């Protein structure tokens, strides 16, 4: 996968290129990350990239010209077919389905805004899509870009040590993940669920699915509205709800 980044703080992305899953993907040649700083494309000696917005008001805007030239330079370093993404509070909210869609492009240029945003003329002429990582305010698009890069990298074949991890993660199947445990078997008086120690793979699979369904029902019930549950999933969810309600009643 090829990713071009347009950012006035390119050094922030060393964390992506040097560490964790994304860092390993870069070392394996599965992920290429290149940065272009709009300041290098400014037409004045102060390398100015921002200015006051027309109409007044607080804050500054990133100017169109340095960003536009940086985008065009990034496009010159890859083949055709690259999609330009602006990380923006006004964009479509990112979810796992959106990650799948974006990762399918293979080549992306990510625009990291700053200040109050960017000149609208750049959005209308150069941006293919706007994406948001949530309904909250950040100081810039760099962190949003890192989140997007990390989530997409997990879908690249060979990026994870265990390919099944990407399938079993929360949201990969539209559900939250089930609880997980590691050694020791008993810690501070808390025991690992016996089914996980049984070695019975079918029972373990059913337990994990039931816990995943139940956790989603408890914490993010709206996610279930978007899913078509199988007969097995409906049965397991009802079992979880029955057991949960009995537990609550016993504690009253």
UniProtKB/Swiss-Prot annotation:
Presence of keyword NAD: no
Top-level lineage group: Bacteria
EC number: 2.1.1.228
Keywords: Cytoplasm, Methyltransferase, S-adenosyl-L-methionine, Transferase, tRNA processing
Alphabetized GO MF terms: tRNA (guanine(37)-N1)-methyltransferase activity
GO cellular component: cytosol
Subcellular location: Cytoplasm
Entry-linked SUPFAM superfamilies: alpha/beta knot
Residues given in the record as S-adenosyl-L-methionine binding sites: 113, 133-138
Pfam families: tRNA_m1G_MT
Catalysed reaction equations from the record: guanosine(37) in tRNA + S-adenosyl-L-methionine = N(1)-methylguanosine(37) in tRNA + S-adenosyl-L-homocysteine + H(+)
Any one Gene Ontology BP term: tRNA N1-guanine methylation
Subunit text: Homodimer.
Function: Specifically methylates guanosine-37 in various tRNAs.
Similarity comment text for this entry: Belongs to the RNA methyltransferase TrmD family.
Name of the molecule in the record: tRNA (guanine-N(1)-)-methyltransferase
Name of the gene encoding the protein in the UniProt record: trmD
């Amino acid at each position: 996968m090829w990713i071009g980044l347009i950012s006035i703080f390119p050094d922030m992305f060393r964390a992506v290129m040097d560490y964790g899953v994304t860092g390993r993907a870069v070392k394996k040649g599965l992920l290429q990350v290149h940065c272009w700083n709009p300041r290098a494309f400014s037409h004045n000696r102060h390398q100015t990239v921002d200015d006051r917005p027309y109409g007044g008001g607080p804050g500054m805007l990133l100017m169109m010209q340095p960003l536009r030239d940086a985008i065009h330079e990034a496009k010159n370093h890859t083949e055709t077919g690259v999609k330009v993404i602006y990380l923006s509070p006004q964009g479509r909210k990112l979810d796992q389905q959106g990650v799948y869609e974006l990762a399918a492009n293979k080549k992306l240029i990510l625009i990291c805004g700053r200040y109050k945003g960017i000149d609208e003329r750049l959005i209308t002429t150069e941006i293919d899509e706007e994406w948001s990582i949530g309904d909250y305010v950040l100081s810039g698009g760099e962190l949003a870009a890192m989140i997007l890069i990390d989530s997409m990298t997990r879908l690249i074949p060979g990026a994870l040590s265990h390919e099944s991890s990407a399938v079993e993660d929360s949201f990969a199947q539209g559900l939250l993940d089930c609880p997980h445990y590691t050694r020791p078997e008993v810690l501070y008086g808390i025991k690992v669920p016996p089914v996980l120690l049984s070695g019975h793979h079918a029972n373990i699979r059913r337990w994990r699915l039931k816990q995943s369904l139940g956790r989603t029902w408890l914490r993010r019930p709206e996610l279930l509205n978007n899913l078509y549950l199988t007969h097995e999933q409906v049965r397991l969810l009802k079992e979880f709800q029955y057991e949960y309600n009995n537990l609550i009643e016993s504690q009253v």
